[in-house]
Protein backbone atom coordinates (compact mmCIF):
# COMPACT_ATOMS: atom_id res chain seq x y z
CA UNK A 1 0.00 0.00 0.00
CA UNK A 2 2.84 2.42 0.85
CA UNK A 3 4.52 1.76 -2.50
CA UNK A 4 1.25 2.33 -4.36
CA UNK A 5 0.86 5.68 -2.65
CA UNK A 6 4.48 6.47 -3.58
CA UNK A 7 3.77 5.83 -7.26
CA UNK A 8 0.68 8.03 -7.18
CA UNK A 9 2.57 10.80 -5.40
CA UNK A 10 5.52 10.56 -7.82
CA UNK A 11 3.26 11.61 -10.71
CA UNK A 12 2.73 15.08 -9.26
CA UNK A 13 5.79 15.70 -7.04
CA UNK A 14 8.66 17.99 -8.17
CA UNK A 15 11.89 16.40 -9.46
CA UNK A 16 13.96 17.16 -6.35
CA UNK A 17 11.35 15.53 -4.09
CA UNK A 18 11.08 12.51 -6.40
CA UNK A 19 14.87 12.12 -6.31
CA UNK A 20 14.98 12.16 -2.50
CA UNK A 21 12.09 9.73 -2.23
CA UNK A 22 13.60 7.36 -4.81
CA UNK A 23 16.90 7.33 -2.93
CA UNK A 24 15.11 6.60 0.36
CA UNK A 25 13.06 3.80 -1.21
CA UNK A 26 16.16 2.22 -2.77
CA UNK A 27 18.04 2.26 0.54
CA UNK A 28 15.03 0.82 2.34
CA UNK A 29 14.83 -1.94 -0.28
CA UNK A 30 18.50 -2.80 0.19
CA UNK A 31 19.00 -2.40 3.92
CA UNK A 32 15.67 -2.94 5.76
CA UNK A 33 13.58 -6.02 6.34
CA UNK A 34 10.57 -6.38 4.06
CA UNK A 35 8.24 -9.27 3.45
CA UNK A 36 8.10 -10.78 -0.03
CA UNK A 37 5.12 -8.67 -1.18
CA UNK A 38 6.70 -5.42 0.02
CA UNK A 39 9.99 -6.22 -1.70
CA UNK A 40 8.18 -7.04 -4.91
CA UNK A 41 6.24 -3.78 -4.88
CA UNK A 42 9.34 -1.75 -3.97
CA UNK A 43 11.25 -3.31 -6.85
CA UNK A 44 8.38 -2.46 -9.20
CA UNK A 45 8.40 1.14 -7.99
CA UNK A 46 12.17 1.49 -8.45
CA UNK A 47 11.91 0.00 -11.92
CA UNK A 48 9.19 2.48 -12.83
CA UNK A 49 11.46 5.32 -11.73
CA UNK A 50 13.81 4.41 -14.58
CA UNK A 51 11.18 6.03 -16.82
CA UNK A 52 11.22 9.27 -14.83
CA UNK A 53 12.04 12.20 -17.14
CA UNK A 54 14.43 13.82 -14.66
CA UNK A 55 18.19 12.95 -14.70
CA UNK A 56 18.21 13.98 -11.03
CA UNK A 57 16.02 11.00 -10.16
CA UNK A 58 18.23 8.64 -12.17
CA UNK A 59 21.33 9.98 -10.42
CA UNK A 60 19.73 9.51 -6.99
CA UNK A 61 18.84 5.91 -7.83
CA UNK A 62 22.33 5.24 -9.16
CA UNK A 63 23.99 6.69 -6.06
CA UNK A 64 21.85 4.48 -3.85
CA UNK A 65 22.35 1.12 -5.59
CA UNK A 66 25.60 1.33 -7.61
CA UNK A 67 27.82 -0.19 -4.94
CA UNK A 68 25.34 -2.77 -3.63
CA UNK A 69 25.76 -6.44 -4.48
CA UNK A 70 22.07 -6.99 -3.59
CA UNK A 71 20.83 -4.46 -6.16
CA UNK A 72 18.45 -5.89 -8.78
CA UNK A 73 20.52 -6.50 -11.89
CA UNK A 74 17.93 -5.10 -14.26
CA UNK A 75 18.11 -1.76 -12.43
CA UNK A 76 21.88 -1.66 -12.98
CA UNK A 77 21.64 -2.43 -16.69
CA UNK A 78 18.70 -0.05 -17.02
CA UNK A 79 20.70 2.82 -15.55
CA UNK A 80 23.63 2.04 -17.86
CA UNK A 81 21.28 2.14 -20.84
CA UNK A 82 20.01 5.58 -19.79
CA UNK A 83 23.49 7.08 -20.20
CA UNK A 84 24.57 10.37 -18.66
CA UNK A 85 25.72 10.81 -15.08
CA UNK A 86 23.67 7.93 -13.69
CA UNK A 87 25.30 5.50 -16.10
CA UNK A 88 28.75 6.82 -15.23
CA UNK A 89 28.14 6.31 -11.50
CA UNK A 90 27.06 2.72 -12.06
CA UNK A 91 29.84 1.89 -14.53
CA UNK A 92 32.49 3.09 -12.10
CA UNK A 93 31.16 1.36 -8.97
CA UNK A 94 29.03 -1.70 -9.66
CA UNK A 95 30.35 -5.24 -9.38
CA UNK A 96 27.32 -6.72 -11.12
CA UNK A 97 28.40 -6.11 -14.71
CA UNK A 98 30.44 -8.78 -16.48
CA UNK A 99 33.66 -8.09 -18.35
CA UNK A 100 31.85 -8.52 -21.64
CA UNK A 101 29.27 -5.90 -20.63
CA UNK A 102 32.02 -3.51 -19.60
CA UNK A 103 33.83 -4.05 -22.91
CA UNK A 104 30.61 -3.27 -24.79
CA UNK A 105 30.04 -0.16 -22.69
CA UNK A 106 33.61 0.95 -23.36
CA UNK A 107 33.23 0.44 -27.10
CA UNK A 108 29.76 1.95 -27.51
CA UNK A 109 29.46 4.40 -24.62
CA UNK A 110 30.09 8.11 -24.41
CA UNK A 111 33.36 9.64 -23.24
CA UNK A 112 31.85 10.06 -19.77
CA UNK A 113 31.03 6.36 -19.67
CA UNK A 114 34.52 5.44 -20.86
CA UNK A 115 36.14 7.61 -18.20
CA UNK A 116 33.95 6.01 -15.53
CA UNK A 117 35.04 2.54 -16.66
CA UNK A 118 38.69 3.62 -16.75
CA UNK A 119 38.39 4.74 -13.11
CA UNK A 120 37.19 1.32 -11.86
CA UNK A 121 39.18 -0.36 -9.12
CA UNK A 122 41.34 -3.23 -10.47
CA UNK A 123 40.06 -2.76 -14.01
CA UNK A 124 40.44 -6.13 -15.82
CA UNK A 125 42.93 -6.42 -18.69
CA UNK A 126 40.32 -7.13 -21.44
CA UNK A 127 38.42 -3.97 -20.52
CA UNK A 128 41.64 -1.95 -20.43
CA UNK A 129 42.45 -3.32 -23.89
CA UNK A 130 39.07 -2.15 -25.22
CA UNK A 131 39.64 1.33 -23.80
CA UNK A 132 43.16 1.53 -25.23
CA UNK A 133 41.79 0.62 -28.64
CA UNK A 134 38.74 2.87 -28.96
CA UNK A 135 38.43 5.24 -25.99
CA UNK A 136 38.87 9.00 -26.14
CA UNK A 137 41.99 10.81 -24.95
CA UNK A 138 40.24 11.72 -21.69
CA UNK A 139 39.40 8.09 -20.97
CA UNK A 140 42.93 6.95 -21.82
CA UNK A 141 44.29 9.58 -19.43
CA UNK A 142 41.99 8.26 -16.70
CA UNK A 143 43.23 4.72 -17.39
CA UNK A 144 46.89 5.77 -17.19
CA UNK A 145 46.24 7.55 -13.88
CA UNK A 146 44.43 4.53 -12.42
CA UNK A 147 47.21 2.82 -10.47
CA UNK A 148 45.09 -0.29 -9.86
CA UNK A 149 44.20 -0.92 -13.52
CA UNK A 150 45.49 -4.27 -14.81
CA UNK A 151 46.73 -2.88 -18.11
CA UNK A 152 49.58 -4.53 -20.00
CA UNK A 153 52.50 -3.33 -22.11
CA UNK A 154 50.44 -3.80 -25.28
CA UNK A 155 47.77 -1.38 -24.03
CA UNK A 156 50.28 1.35 -23.15
CA UNK A 157 51.94 0.97 -26.54
CA UNK A 158 48.57 1.20 -28.30
CA UNK A 159 47.72 4.40 -26.43
CA UNK A 160 51.09 5.86 -27.40
CA UNK A 161 50.40 4.91 -30.99
CA UNK A 162 47.06 6.73 -30.90
CA UNK A 163 47.81 9.70 -28.65
CA UNK A 164 51.62 9.91 -28.45
CA UNK A 165 51.52 13.47 -29.76
CA UNK A 166 49.46 14.59 -26.76
CA UNK A 167 51.67 15.97 -23.96
CA UNK A 168 49.10 15.14 -21.24
CA UNK A 169 49.28 11.44 -22.06
CA UNK A 170 53.07 11.39 -22.21
CA UNK A 171 53.34 13.17 -18.86
CA UNK A 172 50.83 10.81 -17.23
CA UNK A 173 52.71 7.76 -18.52
CA UNK A 174 56.03 9.14 -17.27
CA UNK A 175 54.58 9.25 -13.75
CA UNK A 176 53.89 5.50 -13.74
CA UNK A 177 56.58 3.43 -12.05
CA UNK A 178 55.48 0.09 -13.51
CA UNK A 179 56.10 0.71 -17.22
CA UNK A 180 58.16 -1.86 -19.09
CA UNK A 181 61.44 -1.02 -20.81
CA UNK A 182 59.76 -1.18 -24.22
CA UNK A 183 57.14 1.41 -23.29
CA UNK A 184 59.77 3.68 -21.74
CA UNK A 185 61.96 3.42 -24.84
CA UNK A 186 59.02 4.20 -27.13
CA UNK A 187 58.04 7.13 -24.94
CA UNK A 188 61.60 8.44 -25.01
CA UNK A 189 61.65 8.26 -28.80
CA UNK A 190 58.37 10.15 -29.15
CA UNK A 191 59.49 12.91 -26.77
CA UNK A 192 62.80 13.25 -28.62
CA UNK A 193 61.01 13.58 -31.95
CA UNK A 194 58.58 16.17 -30.61
CA UNK A 195 61.37 18.28 -29.11
CA UNK A 196 63.46 18.15 -32.28
CA UNK A 197 60.52 19.20 -34.42
CA UNK A 198 59.66 22.02 -32.00
CA UNK A 199 63.11 23.64 -31.87
CA UNK A 200 63.59 23.35 -35.64
CA UNK A 201 60.13 24.75 -36.37
CA UNK A 202 60.85 27.75 -34.11
CA UNK A 203 64.22 28.21 -35.84
CA UNK A 204 65.99 28.05 -32.47
CA UNK A 205 68.43 25.47 -33.85
CA UNK A 206 69.35 24.14 -37.26
CA UNK A 207 68.06 20.70 -38.12
CA UNK A 208 71.59 19.26 -37.99
CA UNK A 209 72.32 20.77 -34.57
CA UNK A 210 68.95 19.63 -33.23
CA UNK A 211 69.62 16.09 -34.41
CA UNK A 212 72.99 16.06 -32.62
CA UNK A 213 71.45 17.31 -29.36
CA UNK A 214 68.55 14.86 -29.58
CA UNK A 215 70.96 12.01 -30.28
CA UNK A 216 73.09 12.92 -27.26
CA UNK A 217 70.03 13.27 -25.03
CA UNK A 218 68.70 9.96 -26.35
CA UNK A 219 71.97 8.26 -25.45
CA UNK A 220 71.82 9.67 -21.92
CA UNK A 221 68.20 8.56 -21.60
CA UNK A 222 68.98 5.08 -22.91
CA UNK A 223 71.82 4.75 -20.39
CA UNK A 224 69.53 5.81 -17.55
CA UNK A 225 66.91 3.31 -18.75
CA UNK A 226 69.43 0.48 -18.92
CA UNK A 227 70.67 1.28 -15.40
CA UNK A 228 67.17 1.27 -13.90
CA UNK A 229 67.26 -1.55 -11.35
CA UNK A 230 63.48 -1.96 -11.50
CA UNK A 231 63.72 -3.29 -15.07
CA UNK A 232 65.09 -6.58 -16.34
CA UNK A 233 68.47 -5.82 -17.94
CA UNK A 234 68.15 -8.40 -20.72
CA UNK A 235 64.71 -7.17 -21.71
CA UNK A 236 65.88 -3.55 -21.60
CA UNK A 237 68.86 -4.29 -23.85
CA UNK A 238 66.59 -6.08 -26.33
CA UNK A 239 64.26 -3.06 -26.40
CA UNK A 240 67.15 -0.66 -26.92
CA UNK A 241 68.35 -2.78 -29.82
CA UNK A 242 64.89 -2.77 -31.39
CA UNK A 243 64.86 1.02 -31.06
CA UNK A 244 68.31 1.23 -32.71
CA UNK A 245 69.82 2.71 -29.53
CA UNK A 246 72.37 -0.03 -28.93
CA UNK A 247 75.05 1.93 -30.78
CA UNK A 248 78.85 1.72 -30.43
CA UNK A 249 78.80 5.20 -28.84
CA UNK A 250 76.26 3.99 -26.26
CA UNK A 251 78.38 0.95 -25.36
CA UNK A 252 81.58 3.01 -25.09
CA UNK A 253 79.80 5.58 -22.92
CA UNK A 254 78.53 2.81 -20.62
CA UNK A 255 82.01 1.29 -20.45
CA UNK A 256 83.70 4.57 -19.55
CA UNK A 257 81.06 5.19 -16.86
CA UNK A 258 82.02 1.84 -15.33
CA UNK A 259 78.80 -0.06 -16.06
CA UNK A 260 80.59 -3.36 -16.70
CA UNK A 261 77.51 -5.59 -16.42
CA UNK A 262 75.66 -3.39 -18.89
CA UNK A 263 78.50 -3.60 -21.42
CA UNK A 264 78.58 -7.39 -21.03
CA UNK A 265 74.81 -7.59 -21.63
CA UNK A 266 75.05 -5.34 -24.71
CA UNK A 267 77.85 -7.34 -26.32
CA UNK A 268 76.14 -10.62 -25.44
CA UNK A 269 72.95 -9.46 -27.15
CA UNK A 270 74.74 -8.17 -30.27
CA UNK A 271 76.90 -11.29 -30.72
CA UNK A 272 74.46 -13.92 -29.42
CA UNK A 273 77.11 -15.03 -26.92
CA UNK A 274 76.50 -16.06 -23.28
CA UNK A 275 77.19 -13.28 -20.79
CA UNK A 276 79.73 -15.40 -18.90
CA UNK A 277 81.78 -15.91 -22.05
CA UNK A 278 81.65 -12.19 -22.91
CA UNK A 279 82.79 -11.29 -19.39
CA UNK A 280 85.69 -13.74 -19.78
CA UNK A 281 86.72 -12.10 -23.06
CA UNK A 282 86.61 -8.66 -21.45
CA UNK A 283 88.76 -9.87 -18.57
CA UNK A 284 91.30 -11.67 -20.77
CA UNK A 285 94.68 -9.96 -20.98
CA UNK A 286 95.03 -11.11 -24.58
CA UNK A 287 93.52 -8.56 -26.94
CA UNK A 288 92.85 -10.79 -29.95
CA UNK A 289 89.73 -12.59 -28.56
CA UNK A 290 88.29 -9.30 -27.32
CA UNK A 291 88.87 -7.51 -30.63
CA UNK A 292 87.24 -10.39 -32.49
CA UNK A 293 84.20 -10.16 -30.20
CA UNK A 294 83.98 -6.39 -30.70
CA UNK A 295 84.15 -6.84 -34.47
CA UNK A 296 81.23 -9.30 -34.33
CA UNK A 297 79.29 -6.75 -32.23
CA UNK A 298 79.75 -4.09 -34.91
CA UNK A 299 82.17 -1.91 -32.92
CA UNK A 300 84.31 0.10 -35.40
CA UNK A 301 88.00 -0.80 -35.40
CA UNK A 302 89.00 2.75 -34.42
CA UNK A 303 86.84 2.54 -31.26
CA UNK A 304 88.03 -0.92 -30.20
CA UNK A 305 91.28 0.17 -28.46
CA UNK A 306 89.32 2.01 -25.78
CA UNK A 307 87.92 -1.26 -24.42
CA UNK A 308 91.07 -2.87 -22.95
CA UNK A 309 92.28 0.51 -21.64
CA UNK A 310 88.92 1.35 -20.04
CA UNK A 311 88.62 -2.13 -18.54
CA UNK A 312 92.08 -1.82 -16.99
CA UNK A 313 91.16 1.57 -15.52
CA UNK A 314 87.87 0.18 -14.25
CA UNK A 315 89.65 -2.67 -12.49
CA UNK A 316 92.10 -0.24 -10.91
CA UNK A 317 89.29 2.04 -9.75
CA UNK A 318 87.42 -0.90 -8.21
CA UNK A 319 90.50 -2.01 -6.32
CA UNK A 320 90.95 1.50 -4.96
CA UNK A 321 87.29 1.54 -3.92
CA UNK A 322 87.62 -1.90 -2.25
CA UNK A 323 85.18 -3.51 -4.63
CA UNK A 324 82.58 -0.73 -4.68
CA UNK A 325 80.17 -1.10 -7.59
CA UNK A 326 79.50 2.61 -8.04
CA UNK A 327 80.06 4.00 -11.52
CA UNK A 328 83.17 6.12 -12.08
CA UNK A 329 82.43 9.82 -12.73
CA UNK A 330 82.60 10.30 -16.49
CA UNK A 331 85.16 13.10 -16.58
CA UNK A 332 87.54 11.37 -14.16
CA UNK A 333 87.38 8.14 -16.16
CA UNK A 334 87.94 9.95 -19.44
CA UNK A 335 90.98 11.78 -18.08
CA UNK A 336 92.60 8.50 -17.01
CA UNK A 337 91.76 6.71 -20.24
CA UNK A 338 93.03 9.57 -22.40
CA UNK A 339 96.29 9.69 -20.47
CA UNK A 340 96.94 6.01 -21.16
CA UNK A 341 95.91 6.21 -24.81
CA UNK A 342 98.13 9.21 -25.46
CA UNK A 343 101.12 7.31 -24.07
CA UNK A 344 100.68 4.67 -26.75
CA UNK A 345 99.25 7.01 -29.38
CA UNK A 346 99.63 5.91 -32.98
CA UNK A 347 97.81 6.36 -36.25
CA UNK A 348 95.08 3.98 -35.13
CA UNK A 349 94.28 5.82 -31.91
CA UNK A 350 94.27 9.43 -33.09
CA UNK A 351 90.63 9.34 -34.21
CA UNK A 352 89.67 7.69 -30.94
CA UNK A 353 91.46 10.38 -28.92
CA UNK A 354 89.64 13.12 -30.86
CA UNK A 355 86.32 11.38 -30.12
CA UNK A 356 87.13 11.02 -26.42
CA UNK A 357 88.32 14.64 -26.19
CA UNK A 358 84.92 15.78 -27.48
CA UNK A 359 83.24 13.51 -24.93
CA UNK A 360 85.48 14.93 -22.21
CA UNK A 361 84.49 18.50 -23.15
CA UNK A 362 80.79 17.61 -22.83
CA UNK A 363 81.44 15.92 -19.49
CA UNK A 364 83.31 18.99 -18.21
CA UNK A 365 80.40 21.26 -19.09
CA UNK A 366 77.88 18.94 -17.46
CA UNK A 367 80.04 18.72 -14.33
CA UNK A 368 80.39 22.51 -14.18
CA UNK A 369 76.63 22.98 -14.50
CA UNK A 370 75.97 20.49 -11.70
CA UNK A 371 78.53 22.06 -9.36
CA UNK A 372 77.30 25.60 -10.09
CA UNK A 373 73.72 24.53 -9.43
CA UNK A 374 74.72 23.01 -6.10
CA UNK A 375 76.76 26.07 -5.08
CA UNK A 376 74.02 28.63 -5.67
CA UNK A 377 71.45 28.37 -2.90
CA UNK A 378 68.09 30.08 -2.85
CA UNK A 379 69.30 32.56 -0.22
CA UNK A 380 72.26 33.47 -2.40
CA UNK A 381 69.96 33.99 -5.37
CA UNK A 382 67.76 36.32 -3.31
CA UNK A 383 70.81 38.26 -2.11
CA UNK A 384 72.13 38.59 -5.65
CA UNK A 385 68.79 39.91 -6.88
CA UNK A 386 68.71 42.48 -4.07
CA UNK A 387 72.07 44.03 -5.09
CA UNK A 388 71.82 46.19 -8.24
CA UNK A 389 74.47 45.43 -10.88
CA UNK A 390 77.27 47.99 -11.19
CA UNK A 391 77.22 50.15 -14.27
CA UNK A 392 80.19 50.17 -16.64
CA UNK A 393 82.99 52.29 -15.22
CA UNK A 394 81.72 51.96 -11.67
CA UNK A 395 83.59 48.79 -10.80
CA UNK A 396 85.85 49.33 -7.78
CA UNK A 397 88.37 46.75 -6.70
CA UNK A 398 88.96 46.04 -3.05
CA UNK A 399 92.67 46.75 -2.71
CA UNK A 400 92.94 44.76 0.48
CA UNK A 401 91.27 41.73 -1.08
CA UNK A 402 93.46 41.95 -4.17
CA UNK A 403 96.61 42.27 -2.07
CA UNK A 404 95.57 39.29 -0.01
Predicted regions and their residues:
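Alpha-helical scaffold segments
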Residues: 1-404
